[in-house]
């Protein structure tokens, strides 16, 4: 997947493995990557480098991620900022957005989700339309978190939306029930993979009431696959 198009991104992350993995994937996607290992380095790099976008972990040593964001915004740095949160915690999200961040990704995440968020932020920063994922007649707006099938709005619950977004981001790939379960729950909650079967069943009925599109395939013992190909324009 490529989508960086030479854009310069600052990655502020203290976890070595995650930092190096993300950096490698971002470079592979076409980004030029600067890295910082703590909050103080992040502020310095964020002020000194000509950036297009920044990724900031909230749990940083020396200076918390929220303070990094506040200082960059106080210095009138207007490039988009994507925050990484330790878990799907509403308070982290709210505080991050209030500090000046533009979007968030909760751990654990897949790189495809990070890339989609970055591309969305860069499109908006460039004054482009809100980014959409399109697979056949199914259109998912990653910013507004809305879904349409053949231009007709489909009402989804939060959990249904999360499942659909994850499947569409990785259209054509086999996604295990375990992986989908991790997309739904905080790490502290007891996970029930049977819930995934229920949600996928509801998604099928809502997206494909006539059973014509068959957008979500079940692969017994392996998981699920979104069977409709992604449009090139939505990559």
Where are these regions (language model features)?
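N-terminal/domain-start alpha-helical segments
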Residues: 1-128
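Short, flexible hinge/linker loops that cap or flank conserved catalytic cores
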Residues: 2-4, 75, 127, 132, ...
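Short, Lys/Arg-enriched segments at the junction into DNA-binding effector domains
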Residues: 8, 119-174, 178, 226-232
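A short, glycine- and basic residue-enriched loop/turn
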Residues: 15, 57-58, 66, 87-89, ...
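Glycine-rich nucleotide-binding loop
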Residues: 41, 221-225
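Positively charged, aromatic-enriched patches within helix-turn-helix-type DNA-binding elements
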Residues: 146-222
